[in-house]
């Protein structure tokens, strides 16, 4: 038996070295500059040229927010069903399977319990890549469980939102989650357990209309789209041009809808200081 085999095909005798560059560069949608992907990732997925905050997945977000090797994920066994047998361009059940395959998650949120700069916290982080981060029965149940876990342990709660709103494929079951989570947060508030809401790009629809805006402290990342209906829908409805920057986090801060706009690099220490202040 031969130990070595010559690969089939002709040898490249041109003397030219082929270097693959596909996927190594990213174009910033804001400043239109070309960025080396490694530089972008090392800068926490924030454009080093203009400061635009790129969207990041829930696992990356969780790793940035909580201390390394100091947290565990929870409730990851819950999975949505298809109560209405909903079909649009394709069956909802197929959309679920595809989203689960693409993200490696059961649904659009990750629950965790751990430490943030040494401070114990309970966290829920939404995954926009899972059907637009939409909120169905499982998302509602998981966030409610996080609230109740924070309540039982008297541990501060952090929810990071990234969502297009209620999941239409689950109908009224999805809409019920707004009230369910809000009621749980009311119990948390009554017990005087801190709740910090972090709104990222985008946070819209029923998520904005419920738990995302109910924090003791509502923080947003720079440039995040935050609102109920999207700006295009509003313009078509009122037949007027909206102001520049409308529904962006800086606009909302200027008009009293947010407590702070905090860059991604500063978010973790900012929350830590806020928790210390609330505990004082």
Listing of model-derived features with the role each one plays in the protein:
Residues 8-18, 26-27, 54-111:
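An N-cap/entry alpha-helix motif that binds or orients negatively charged groups
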Residues 25, 44:
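Residues immediately within or flanking Cys/His clusters that coordinate Zn2+
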Residues 28-31, 47-50:
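Short cysteine-rich clusters marking metal-coordination/redox-active sites
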Residues 34-35, 53-54:
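Cys/His-rich microdomains that often coordinate metals
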Residues 45-49, 55-56:
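Short, small/acidic-rich helices and loops at N termini and domain boundaries
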Residues 110-189, 196:
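Cleft-lining beta-strand/loop regions that shape enzyme active-site pockets
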Residues 161-279:
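Conserved catalytic cores of soluble enzyme domains
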């Amino acid at each position: 038996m031969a130990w070595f085999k010559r690969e089939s095909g002709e040898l490249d005798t041109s003397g030219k070295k082929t270097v693959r560059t596909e996927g190594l560069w990213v174009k910033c949608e804001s400043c239109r500059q070309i960025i080396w992907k490694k530089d972008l990732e090392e800068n926490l997925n924030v454009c080093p040229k203009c400061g635009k905050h790129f969207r990041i997945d829930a696992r990356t977000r969780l790793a940035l927010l909580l201390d390394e090797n100091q947290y565990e994920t929870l409730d990851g066994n819950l999975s949505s069903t298809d109560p209405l047998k909903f079909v649009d361009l394709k069956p909802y059940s197929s959309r679920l399977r595809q989203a689960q395959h693409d993200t490696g998650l059961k649904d659009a949120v990750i629950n965790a319990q751990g430490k943030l700069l040494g401070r114990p916290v309970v966290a829920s982080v939404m995954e926009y890549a899972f059907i637009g981060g939409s909120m169905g029965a499982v998302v509602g149940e998981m966030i409610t469980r996080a609230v109740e876990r924070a309540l039982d342990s008297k541990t501060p709660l952090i929810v990071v939102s990234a969502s297009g709103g209620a999941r239409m494929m689950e109908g009224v079951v999805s809409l019920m989650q707004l009230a369910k989570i809000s009621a749980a947060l009311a119990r948390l508030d009554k017990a005087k357990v801190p709740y910090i809401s972090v709104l990222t790009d985008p946070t819209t629809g029923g998520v904005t209309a419920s738990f995302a805006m109910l924090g003791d402290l509502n923080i947003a990342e720079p440039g995040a789209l935050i609102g109920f209906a999207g700006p295009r829908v509003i313009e078509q409805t009122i037949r007027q041009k909206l102001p520049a920057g409308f529904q962006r986090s800086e606009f909302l801060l200027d008009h009293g809808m947010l407590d702070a706009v905090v860059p991604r690099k500063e978010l973790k220490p900012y929350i830590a200081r806020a928790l210390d202040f609330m505990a004082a």
